[in-house]
């Protein structure tokens, strides 16, 4: 089966592409460096020739609201027009758990535009909403750290390993379109500061975690349960501590 992976040069895209190729599928990488630009439409029609499935793992160059909304609206329009012309039978998009619940956050509002674009397109689709990745922990520490202190929110957190994310993307790709939304999350739920503290403990870094109910996440005030599933979800297999031990040992 021929599958176009938009954002195929990114970390998630590379892993998804490798797994699909290992299963015997023909994967086309959709990125400007491979001659496919979803912002201009360049190379899209050629990439979609005899293609059955599109996986959209694209992201804006900046999380800033205006930039992100412009990206997802423009790219989404180009993708839908090209996919309708090519009779694509399944479009998948990777999104974020909680997108509906905090539209005052500009980036989530942009992701909602991306979701709605494919929902209203007439193309069979599956939206995969994921919690934050285990691999995001270093970014949290970098953004919220100051000298030897890391200020971390006590909001609910249920991160998932990138390995599990890509396994689910491949699984849903090879299933029939849901024409709806599925959610994926890690196997363990706790407060965000618990995960960060455990990671720092395993790493041996001389950092101290400070947290309270008012602490911000990535400089944003977010609802306590925004980043975790509110209903049914597909659980990952890799526990955070096991991932951290493996990652930090390398």
Model feature map: region roles:
Residues 125-126, 139-160:
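A conserved pocket-lining segment of Rossmann-fold NAD(P)-dependent short-chain dehydrogenase/reductase
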Residues 1-23:
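N-terminal Rossmann NAD(P)H-binding glycine-rich loop of SDR-like oxidoreductase domains
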Residues 135-146, 172-182, 188, 205-206:
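Glycine/proline-rich active-site loop of Rossmann-fold NAD(P)-dependent oxidoreductases
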Residues 54, 165-169, 184, 192-195, ...:
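Non-catalytic, hydrophobic alpha-helical segments
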Residues 151-156, 182-189:
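Glycine-rich Rossmann NAD(P)(H)-binding loop
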Residues 21-86, 97-103:
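NAD(P)H-binding glycine-rich loop region in Rossmannoid oxidoreductase-like domains
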Residues 189, 196-250:
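Mobile cap/lid helix-loop segments that border enzyme active or cofactor-binding sites
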Residues 90, 95, 116-136:
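Conserved beta-loop-beta element that borders a ligand/cofactor-binding pocket
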């Amino acid at each position: 089966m021929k599958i176009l992976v938009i954002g195929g040069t990114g970390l998630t895209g590379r892993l998804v592409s490798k797994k699909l190729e290992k299963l015997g599928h023909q994967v086309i990488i959709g990125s400007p460096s491979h001659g496919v630009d979803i912002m201009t439409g360049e190379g899209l029609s050629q990439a979609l020739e005899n293609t059955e499935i599109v996986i959209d793992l694209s992201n804006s160059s900046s999380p800033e609201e205006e930039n992100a909304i412009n990206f997802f609206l423009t790219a989404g329009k180009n993708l839908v027009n090209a996919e309708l012309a090519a009779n694509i039978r399944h479009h998948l998009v990777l999104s974020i758990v909680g997108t509906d619940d905090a539209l005052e956050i500009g980036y989530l509002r942009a992701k909602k535009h991306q979701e709605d674009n494919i929902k209203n397109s007439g193309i069979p689709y599956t939206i995969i909403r994921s919690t934050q990745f285990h691999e995001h922990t270093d970014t949290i520490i970098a953004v919220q750290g100051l000298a030897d202190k890391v200020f971390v929110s006590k909001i609910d957190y249920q991160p998932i390993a990138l390995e599990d994310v890509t396994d689910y993307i491949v699984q849903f790709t090879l299933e029939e379109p849901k024409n709806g939304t599925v959610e994926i999350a890690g196997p363990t739920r706790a407060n965000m500061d618990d995960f960060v503290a455990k990671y720092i403990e395993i790493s041996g870094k001389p950092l101290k975690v400070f947290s309270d109910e008012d602490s911000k996440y990535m400089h944003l005030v977010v609802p306590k349960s925004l980043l975790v599933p509110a209903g049914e979800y597909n659980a990952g297999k890799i526990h955070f501590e096991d991932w951290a031990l493996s990652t930090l040992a390398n």
